[in-house]
C-alpha cells in the first residue's frame, strides 16, 4: 500500500513538472509569417519578452531572471499599471474612489482563436483583485502581412465609478543597443516632413492636442530602426507603428536606466480623464505594428499590404481619378489655363476635373489668400 502511494505521488509530481515545463502552459505566443511577439504568465504577472524575428520555441525565455534590482523596478510588463514597483510611465493609471491610485493587474487567463483566413486573435485577461478592474489585452496577428494590432479593453468591475487617467492602447518594451526614431511632422503646404534622431535616456514624446487635426503637424506613426544610427530602406531590424485614432494622441518613447526602450501609444492623457461607471467597458483605439529585418522599405510595404487587404474599405475596386487645379495653377488662372488642364484630364482618361479655390472676380480678383474669396463671376 505504501509503495503504491509513493508511486502515485511520483506520478503526480512528474505530471506537475511536465505541466510547468510545457511552454504552452505559460507562454503566450503571437505570431505572423516572419515575426513573433512573446509574453509569459509568471507569478501572477504578464511579462513581455520579445517582439521581433520569428522564434519557434519560446522555452529559451523560461526562467529568465530579471536584470533589474528589486529596489528599482520589475521585469517589462505587457500592460504596466500605476502601482506596485513599476516606476516608468504606466499604460494604465486609474483614480479609484477615495483618491486611491494603486492598480496591480494579475494574470487570469488567455486564449487564441482564428478570426478569418490568416488572422488570429489572442486575448489576455488581467484583473486587480482589490479593485475588480478588469483588462483584456487584444492582439490580432495578420500572418501574411507580418502585422500585429493591439488594443486594450478596460472594465470597471467595482461598485463605484472610477476615473481613467492613462489608458494607452499598447505598451511595447524593446531592447537594443541603439534606437533611431523616424517620424513625420509639418504644417500647411509642407506636410509629412521626415525627421530621424537617435534616442537617448529620458522621454521623447510625439503628440497632438488639437482634436481631430491630428496629422497636420504631427503624424501618429513612427519607424524605429534598431542597433543603428542611420536610415536604411533595404536592410536592418525595424519596428514600425501607426495609431488608428483621429483625436488627441501621444506616442511616448522612454529609455530607462537599463537602456530598455518603453513605447506607449494611444489617446493623449492630457485633458482626457474618463469616468467609467460600474460595469462599463472602455475600448481603446488600435495600435498597428510591423517588424522586419529587411529595412524601413519592407516595414512600409507591410503596412501598405495590410491597409489594402484589411484596412481600407473596398480596396480592390479601382477608384475614379481626378485632377485638382490648385497645385498646378494656384491663383494664376485664366480661361486658357483651365481649358488646357481639362483637355489634359480627358487625354489621360481621368474622370473629373476640380476647379479649386476658383472664385475669381474682376473687380476684386482672387490674387492671394487674403482677398477675393467667394467673389465669383461666371
Segment roles from a protein language model:
Residues 23-31, 35-38, 45-254, 270:
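Polysaccharide-binding surfaces and accessory modules of carbohydrate-active proteins
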Amino acid at each position: 500500500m505504501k509503495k503504491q502511494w509513493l508511486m502515485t505521488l511520483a506520478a503526480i509530481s512528474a505530471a506537475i513538472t511536465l505541466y510547468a515545463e510545457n511552454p504552452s502552459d505559460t507562454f503566450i505566443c503571437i505570431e505572423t509569417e516572419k515575426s513573433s511577439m512573446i509574453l509569459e504568465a509568471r507569478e501572477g504577472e504578464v511579462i513581455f519578452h520579445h517582439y521581433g524575428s520569428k522564434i519557434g520555441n519560446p522555452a529559451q525565455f523560461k526562467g529568465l531572471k530579471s536584470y533589474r534590482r528589486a529596489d528599482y523596478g520589475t521585469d517589462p510588463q505587457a500592460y504596466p499599471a500605476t502601482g506596485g514597483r513599476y516606476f516608468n510611465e504606466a499604460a494604465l493609471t486609474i483614480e479609484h474612489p477615495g483618491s486611491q491610485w494603486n492598480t496591480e493587474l494579475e494574470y487570469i487567463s488567455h486564449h487564441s482563436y482564428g478570426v478569418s483566413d490568416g488572422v488570429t486573435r489572442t486575448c489576455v485577461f488581467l484583473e486587480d483583485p482589490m479593485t475588480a478592474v478588469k483588462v483584456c489585452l487584444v492582439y490580432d496577428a495578420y500572418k501574411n502581412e507580418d502585422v500585429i494590432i493591439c488594443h486594450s479593453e478596460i472594465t470597471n468591475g467595482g461598485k463605484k465609478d472610477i476615473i481613467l487617467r492613462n489608458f494607452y492602447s499598447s505598451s511595447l518594451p524593446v531592447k537594443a543597443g541603439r534606437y533611431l526614431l523616424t517620424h513625420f511632422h509639418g504644417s500647411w503646404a509642407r506636410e509629412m516632413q521626415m525627421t530621424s534622431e537617435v534616442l537617448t535616456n529620458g522621454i521623447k514624446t510625439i503628440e497632438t492636442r488639437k482634436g481631430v487635426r491630428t496629422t497636420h503637424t504631427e503624424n501618429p506613426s513612427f519607424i524605429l530602426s534598431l542597433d543603428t544610427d542611420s536610415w536604411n530602406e533595404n536592410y536592418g531590424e525595424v519596428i514600425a507603428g501607426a495609431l488608428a485614432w483621429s483625436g488627441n494622441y501621444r506616442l511616448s518613447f522612454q529609455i530607462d536606466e537599463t537602456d530598455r526602450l518603453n513605447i506607449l501609444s494611444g489617446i493623449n492623457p492630457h485633458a482626457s480623464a474618463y469616468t467609467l461607471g460600474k460595469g462599463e467597458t472602455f475600448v481603446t483605439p488600435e495600435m498597428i505594428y510591423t517588424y522586419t529585418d529587411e529595412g524601413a522599405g519592407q516595414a512600409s510595404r507591410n503596412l501598405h499590404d495590410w491597409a489594402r487587404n484589411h484596412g481600407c474599405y473596398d480596396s480592390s475596386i479601382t477608384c475614379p481619378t481626378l485632377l485638382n487645379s490648385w497645385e498646378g495653377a494656384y491663383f494664376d488662372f485664366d480661361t486658357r489655363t483651365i481649358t488646357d488642364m481639362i483637355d489634359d484630364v480627358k487625354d489621360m482618361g481621368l474622370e473629373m476635373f476640380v476647379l479649386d479655390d476658383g472664385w475669381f472676380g474682376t473687380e476684386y480678383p482672387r490674387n492671394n489668400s487674403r482677398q477675393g474669396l467667394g467673389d465669383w463671376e461666371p
